[in-house]
Amino acid sequence: MNQKKDEKVINQAVKMLTISEDEAGQRIDNYLLAKLKGVPKSLIYRILRKGEVRVNKGRIKPEYKLQANDIVRVPPVRVSEKEHAPISTKLNKVSQLEKQILFEDECLLVLNKPSGIAVHGGSGLSFGVIEALRTLRPDARFLELVHRLDRDTSGILLVAKKRSALRSLHEQLREKTVQKDYLALVRGQWQSHCKVVKAPLLKNELSSGERIVRVSEQGKPSETRFSIEERYEYATLVKASPVTGRTHQIRVHTQYAGHPIALDDKYGDKHFDEQMTQLGLTRLFLHAFSIRFEHPKTGETLRINAPLDPEMKKILGALREQKSSN
């Protein structure tokens, strides 16, 4: 088949790849996303669905977990030049990701993720943090997200550079030995006695594909600890420490407590959001500012902090000024 003018061949011919011990344990879709850099997620799923990708000569589903010594057949892949445009040209923020790396060694990378960038491509997004990092680190054999952050939430994001590091960090998350702290600017005066919110959360998917979470007895047990950092006239800066890790947990728990987060398009308060917009806020005020965990290789306790972005600092400064002038 002739190559079209506006097409780029990512994989010239059929490749038979043997899975190493380090590559084992990951899903085939994630493996292909890393191997076929620049190929849209939709195309990866298409070649999996059509059976063009095979493992040990058999068809597999996207969620298939690779085993050591599996033999993966990867077909030739063509994408349009437009689709293959370097990620950094698609969004200026992504080219700034390099400057947002807080810590990096041979095992892991810790990023201060900007607001507005998804951690993964998909859902109508052509790229995410992980795809951008694979572009910034073309020689990295392994780059996988350890956990997730909502697109509009900024702050600390852990990325494993080795399968062994990913396993160790996932185990720490399961054992609840990872301490994660967030800063959230919420409506009104947070009550001093409200130190823990325990409310089960149920995830729903709307017909549009949008995910929405609500408090429900049918939901999963969920717990967030809160402490007051600073009070303002009509808002409070709180520290939120999730004990469980449910989707939108902090956002729904603050709303449930009667204090929604500033500029939360799903769970927020219109009047409060208007006040915040007038001060210059353009994004959800939720930031993962601190994490503590054991280094997967050395066992040393690491504590990493991510500074607030300039916009958040400016908003807090404006709120302090308002408070002192009244």
From Swiss-Prot:
Residue ranges of domain S4 RNA-binding in the record: 26-98
Enzyme Commission identifier(s): 5.4.99.24
Enzyme class: isomerase
Keyword entries, A-Z: Isomerase, RNA-binding, rRNA processing
Reaction(s) the record says it catalyses: uridine(955/2504/2580) in 23S rRNA = pseudouridine(955/2504/2580) in 23S rRNA
Domain of life: Bacteria
Pfam families registered for this protein in UniProt: PseudoU_synth_2, S4
InterPro entries linked: PsdUridine_synth_cat_dom_sf (IPR020103), PsdUridine_synth_RluA-like_CS (IPR006224), PsdUridine_synth_RluC/D (IPR006225), PsdUridine_synth_RsuA/RluA (IPR006145), RluA_PseudoU_synthase (IPR050188), S4_RNA-bd (IPR002942), S4_RNA-bd_sf (IPR036986)
Signal peptide region: none
Keyword rRNA processing attributed: yes
Keyword RNA-binding: yes
Active site: D150
Listed NCBIfam families: PRK11025.1, rluA_subfam
Stated role: Responsible for synthesis of pseudouridine from uracil at positions 955, 2504 and 2580 in 23S ribosomal RNA.
PANTHER family, per database record: MITOCHONDRIAL RNA PSEUDOURIDINE SYNTHASE, RIBOSOMAL LARGE SUBUNIT PSEUDOURIDINE SYNTHASE C
Entry similarity comment: Belongs to the pseudouridine synthase RluA family.
Protein name: Ribosomal large subunit pseudouridine synthase C
Species annotation: Pasteurella multocida (strain Pm70)
Designated gene of the protein: rluC
